[in-house]
Amino acid sequence: MNTATGVIALLVLATVIGCIEAEDTRADLQGGEAAEKVFRRSPTCIPSGQPCPYNENCCSQSCTFKENENGNTVKRCD
């Protein structure tokens, strides 16, 4: 077996193994167990003093406009 044939055989083997492993984590469009594994949300929140795009992401659940070091007004978590 020459080098080119060996490389092709390894690529085919890697593709087959990849397809078998991907079978375990494919998205379940019905909202079953696979969907819960793939689409998991982190329970982290934005600490106080950090910029906040939305109030619900702040640990304090509160976001107000404050002046930053440049003199601009930005929303920050309380």
Curated annotation (Swiss-Prot):
GO terms for biological process: defense response. Residues 1-22 form the signal peptide. The record marks 51, 68, 76 as: Critical for insecticidal activity. Its main location: secreted. Disulfide bonds join 45-59, 52-63, 58-77. GO terms for molecular function: calcium channel inhibitor activity; sodium channel regulator activity; toxin activity. Belongs to the neurotoxin 08 (Shiva) family. 01 (omega toxin) subfamily. This toxin comes from a male specimen. It is observed that propeptide sequences coming from male specimen are identical but have only limited homology with the female paralogs, but the reason is unknown. The presence of a 'disulfide through disulfide knot' structurally defines this protein as a knottin. This is Omega-hexatoxin-Ar1d. It comes from Atrax robustus (Sydney funnel-web spider).
